[in-house]
């Protein structure tokens, strides 16, 4: 015998994402049940509460709600009871317990959790973008980057990019190789979003030598050769001089955090 579909109304003072996730998690414990969700969001006034319940009464079902305003939550409880509706308050009992536990009243500001979730998803998207645009990958995506870092190999492009990504910025980085022009897409974006990284030659020799040893290789050849590195850096400097709109940062004595702070202050501040 086919079960009838039950209606569940999700009422929220924000987007309703939180209440829906909780209800779906609870429903996963039940087999062979069918539910149709109806979201009613942005409930911020008494009129909104009354209108929401009128919507519920068109095709009655269970009401599950998250309203941080205690007066609106009480109004919804009273009206639901008056109409014989099952209504479950997901957040008020928790707010009361937390208030007692911490000895502090809640802010009662709608949408705070959604704001936190949005910031989290922004960081996730930024990290995903940055990974996909590391070391010159997919130059077509440079236009979507908040910052574009350029510099020679081992000049902190990747760690700096990832640090900024965890701050919520989409970052691409492009390697500068002596004698090879950067991709043309680099010059089609807002040039004030491009950051040129420069580093002292001796410090770069140390970094590249350590890198080779970590890979089990002898520090021979041009990769860690001082004169070769000086030539690479001079090629970089000439490129930066030809593009005066780029922000140039010397990372020799700066930590990743310090370099990131300078970029954010000068380009996003």
UniProtKB/Swiss-Prot annotation:
Q: What is the lineage of its organism?
A: Bacteria, Pseudomonadati, Thermodesulfobacteriota, Desulfuromonadia, Geobacterales
Under the heading Pfam families, the entry gives:
Kinase-PPPase
Identify the HAMAP family for this entry. Answer: PDRP
Q: What does this protein do?
A: Bifunctional serine/threonine kinase and phosphorylase involved in the regulation of the pyruvate, phosphate dikinase (PPDK) by catalyzing its phosphorylation/dephosphorylation.
As for family, the record states: Belongs to the pyruvate, phosphate/water dikinase regulatory protein family. PDRP subfamily.
- Give me the reactions it catalyses: N(tele)-phospho-L-histidyl/L-threonyl-[pyruvate, phosphate dikinase] + ADP = N(tele)-phospho-L-histidyl/O-phospho-L-threonyl-[pyruvate, phosphate dikinase] + AMP + H(+); N(tele)-phospho-L-histidyl/O-phospho-L-threonyl-[pyruvate, phosphate dikinase] + phosphate + H(+) = N(tele)-phospho-L-histidyl/L-threonyl-[pyruvate, phosphate dikinase] + diphosphate
EC number of this enzyme: 2.7.11.32, 2.7.4.27
Question: Which InterPro entries does this UniProt record tie to the protein?
Answer: Kinase-pyrophosphorylase (IPR005177), PPDK_reg (IPR026565)
Q: What GO terms are given for molecular function?
A: ADP binding; ATP binding; phosphotransferase activity, phosphate group as acceptor; protein serine/threonine kinase activity
Binding of ADP, residues: 151-158
User: Any idea which UniProt keywords this protein has?
Assistant: Kinase, Nucleotide-binding, Serine/threonine-protein kinase, Transferase
- Keyword Transferase part of the UniProt annotation: yes
The molecule here is called Putative pyruvate, phosphate dikinase regulatory protein
The enzyme's main class, written as a single word, is transferase
């Amino acid at each position: 015998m086919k079960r009838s579909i039950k209606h569940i109304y999700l009422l929220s003072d924000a987007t309703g994402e939180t209440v829906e996730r909780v209800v779906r998690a609870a429903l996963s414990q039940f087999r062979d049940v069918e539910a149709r969700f109806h979201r009613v969001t942005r409930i911020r006034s008494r009129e909104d509460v009354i209108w929401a319940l009128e919507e519920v009464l068109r095709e009655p079902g269970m009401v599950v709600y998250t309203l941080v305003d205690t007066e609106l939550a009480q109004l919804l409880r009273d009206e639901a009871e008056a109409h014989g509706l099952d209504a479950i308050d997901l957040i008020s009992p928790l707010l009361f317990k937390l208030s007692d536990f911490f000895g502090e009243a809640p802010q009662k500001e709608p949408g705070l959790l959604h704001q936190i979730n949005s910031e989290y998803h922004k960081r996730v998207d930024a990290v995903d973008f940055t990974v996909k645009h590391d070391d010159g990958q997919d130059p077509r995506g440079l236009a979507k980057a908040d910052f574009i870092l350029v510099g020679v190999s081992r000049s902190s492009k990747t760690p700096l990019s990832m640090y900024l990504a965890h701050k919520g910025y989409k970052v691409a980085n492009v390697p500068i190789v002596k004698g090879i022009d950067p991709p043309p897409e680099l010059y089609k974006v807002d040039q004030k979003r491009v950051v040129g990284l420069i580093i002292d030659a001796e410090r770069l020799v140390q970094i590249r030598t350590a890198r080779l040893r970590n890979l089990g290789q002898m520090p021979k050849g041009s990769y860690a050769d001082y004169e070769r590195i000086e030539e690479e850096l001079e090629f970089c400097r000439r490129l930066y001089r030809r593009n005066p709109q780029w922000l140039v940062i010397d990372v020799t004595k700066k930590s990743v955090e310090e370099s990131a702070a300078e970029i954010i202050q000068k380009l996003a501040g």
